[in-house]
Amino acid sequence: MDTEGFGELLQQAEQLAAETEAVSELPHVERNLQEIQQAGERLRSRTLTRTSQDTADVKASILLGSRGLDIFHISQRLESLSAATTFEPLEPVKDTDIQGFLKNERDNALLSAIEESRRRTFLLAEEYHRDSMLVQWEQVKQRVLHTLLGAGEDALDFSQEVEPSFVSEVGVPGRSALDSVEVAYSRQIYVFNEKIVNGHLQPNLGDLCASVAESLDDKNVSEMWLMVKQMTDVLLVPAKDTLKSRVSVDMQMAFVRQALQFLENSYKNYTLVTVFGNLHQAQLGGVPGTYQLVCSFLNIKLPTPLPGRQDGEVEGHPVWALIYFCLRCGDLSAAMQVVNKAQHQLGDFKIWFQEYMNSPDRRLSPATENKLRLHYRRVLRNSADPYKRAVYCLIGKCDIGDNHGEVADKTEDYLWLKLNQVCFDEDGSSSPQDRMTLAQLQKQLLEDYGESHFSASHQPFLYFQVLFLTAQFEAAIAFLFRVERLRSHAVHVALVLYELKLLLKSSGQSAQLLSQEAGDPPMVRRLNFIRLLMLYTRKFESTDPREALQYFYFLRNEKDSQGENMFMRCVSELVIESREFDMLLGRLEKDGSRKPGVIDKFAGDTRAIITKVASEAENKGLFEEAVKLYELAKNADKVLELMNKLLSPVIAQVSEPQSNKERLKNMAVAIAERYRANGVAGEKSVDNTFYLLLDLMTFFDEYHAGHIDRAYDVIERLKLVPLSQDSVEERVAAFRNFSDEVRHNLSEVLLATMNILFTQYKRLKGAAAGTPGRPQRTLEDRDMLLRIQARALITFAGMIPYRMAGDTNARLVQMEVLMN
């Protein structure tokens, strides 16, 4: 800036200062240079803020404009957009605008319907999701349970003996999950099933299982099977309804009678062992029989005079103790012998006991019973002689609240005493303290006392006996099954009861092992027999499938919740789990005949079972196994259908030793040879697809091996793709009839064919350059033919109604261009 400019600026400043001084109302502001600089910076920043937005807009326009975008037009469009919702009126609706009002109402109704539908859809989806989660969780629980069960102590590997097994014709290779007890039981199950499948008279399964106990040399197991045989030795009435049979009075009376007989026989054996073990103290002599046995036993049990004894003695022993122990041994005649010897001291008891002894069901008449009970309440309730009180309570079935601990000091004695007091008739005259039903006794033992009272964890056989002798078979089995080392015994007791139709089964497979069902009488429990058997076999079905199959045969008449036969279902799962297809279901020989498997002896219609297993294998994605099984079942359609699915993904691959393609190729060729030799054919379209895929596999094998001319001959013979313009339309029309398995490989077929043509083209050009004497006309014709064939492939690829994979078309065009 020149001097004149500064002078003019100075003049203007002085003029401004003069004008400011002329205004006296305004105060003077004195600023130093720093304050003036700060004020100038503030003014400058305001100016930049206003201009920066314009500068940014200009820069954005330059950037986007270089990419062909009109930012001014875009800004206008963005400003014109409205944030109003779809169903909101853009303009306020006037009160008199009926059409607008109706439109709004209609839109609101639609919106409400959509919202309600959305809400219901989400609720339904949540419900389906919850149900699916519950089903999956139940399946996971079952798998966890089965896994835990299979990992128990008894699941340790057990080496089989070298001697041949009765259960299988050929010993199971490797290790077995069965222990020695389970092996012994499985042999008896094999013997039992063999008799049945061969049409022989059905043997007694209880006797077969009891023979296992003899070989085990275990007193508890032997007594258990003796008890099971005793309790099941009742008159079996054919009945479709097991529950009705089990709760009938006659059947329950028979159970009580058998239980008493077992307890009495056991006690008599105990007295014999005691007496013969202490002959010097017992002083056994006289006429052999229960009376002399009891007298000798009392010499050991009651060596000193009994305090509080009443009514004298017989041959030096308290009379009531003699009567009680004769009754405890189950010999009423011996007890009557004692009564006769002491009848003068016993009053009316002889008459009452004679009536009791002659009664078929060990029950006094109501009148006599009332007299005895009255006498007991008046005279004997507080008697000092415990044996006298016990005998009166037995004969009169009274005072059920007294446990007679001085006499019945063992669980077996207590049980025998209570079973003697059980009543079955509807006697309204009896007071509650004088009447005990079997259901009341069952409840007392199972629910009121329970496992802790009987120390069941330390004495499992005792608690099992308590439940079993009171006809609580299902609860007894379920308890014993929970004890790992005794599980095999529980399962085989259940099998014995099942065969005798004495077992109450759960109505649903999903029920717990022991359950109560609505509508059943009190104290009736049901056992989930199917689950029991499946849990037991789960441990060894993968290592010992033959043995597992023997147990599954017991389920041949059972159905699951969908009505499916449980035997077929279990066999299906067993085969897939163990993968022993040939051993269990049979094997197909080279001539197409079927070598029988283990299943043949159990089922008349093995084809149905094999088809079921094949279907399961197919559903699980085990297609190769399913093919073999469907071929066993002579279902050619399914064999070829699955083979087509297996071959389709691999036919274009390079064949290598032990590869998937090589294995599937050998499998397919073997099937084709068998079917051709035996005249077997499937449904026409499936059959044609199978043989076409085999031919395509041959084509690709020749192509990958470098045999170009052979591969060309194969593809020309198949007539799958056109090799001339005249055949394009025909091949496009035929393409619609091909299955998806063939269509999926079309890209590879076209590329391979074009590669063959291109290779032949290059070879032709090389031959022309190397042999100049060759007729030019022939070379030109061959060259033209190859280009026409390549053009036909390009035309075909463009006309077929199928989207080929990736860059197939581009690669085809590229090779065709190289040929031109």
UniProtKB/Swiss-Prot annotation:
One of its GO terms (molecular function) is structural constituent of nuclear pore. Disruption phenotype: Mutants can be recognized on day 2 of embryogenesis by the presence of necrotic cells in the tectum and eyes. Dye mutants die on day 5 of development. It is a peripheral membrane protein. GO terms for cellular component: nuclear membrane; nuclear periphery; nuclear pore. It is found in: Nucleus membrane; Nucleus, Nuclear pore complex. It comes from the Eukaryota. Keywords: Membrane, mRNA transport, Nuclear pore complex, Nucleus, Protein transport, Translocation, Transport. GO terms for biological process: nuclear pore complex assembly; poly(A)+ mRNA export from nucleus; protein import into nucleus. Pfam families: Nic96. Belongs to the nucleoporin interacting component (NIC) family. Plays a role in the nuclear pore complex (NPC) assembly and/or maintenance. This is Nuclear pore complex protein Nup93. The gene is dye.
